[in-house]
């Protein structure tokens, strides 16, 4: 099993209210550079927090706060 990076260990004490589509900097920590959502194993979040975070990512993409993909080639 791959080790969880140190940054995600710090995020475990977040409340579910902290995940908000307007908090782009926080949500982008749980996304790959390509724009995909990281897995629970990589983020270290609970199932409930992971679902909330994924929902907020979808909102951000719909509102064009983050792109759907990194680049079109």
UniProtKB/Swiss-Prot annotation:
Pfam families listed in its UniProt record: Ribosomal_S18 (PF01084)
SUPFAM superfamilies: Ribosomal protein S18
One Gene Ontology term, aspect cellular component: ribonucleoprotein complex
Name of this protein: Small ribosomal subunit protein bS18
Protein family: Belongs to the bacterial ribosomal protein bS18 family.
GO terms classed as biological process: translation
HAMAP family with a match to the protein in the record: Ribosomal_bS18
Function per UniProt: Binds as a heterodimer with protein bS6 to the central domain of the 16S rRNA, where it helps stabilize the platform of the 30S subunit.
Domain of life, per lineage: Bacteria
A single MF term (Gene Ontology): small ribosomal subunit rRNA binding
Assembly behavior: Part of the 30S ribosomal subunit. Forms a tight heterodimer with protein bS6.
UniProt KW keywords: Ribonucleoprotein, Ribosomal protein, RNA-binding, rRNA-binding
TM ranges: none
Signal peptide: none
Lineage, broadest ranks: Bacteria, Pseudomonadati, Pseudomonadota, Alphaproteobacteria, Rickettsiales
């Amino acid at each position: 099993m791959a080790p969880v990076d140190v940054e995600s260990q710090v995020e475990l004490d977040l409340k579910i209210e902290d995940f908000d589509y307007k908090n782009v900097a926080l949500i982008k920590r749980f996304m790959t550079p390509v724009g995909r959502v990281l897995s629970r194993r990589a983020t270290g979040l609970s199932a409930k927090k992971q679902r909330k975070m994924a929902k907020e990512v979808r909102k951000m993409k719909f509102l064009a706060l983050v792109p759907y993909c990194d680049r079109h080639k």
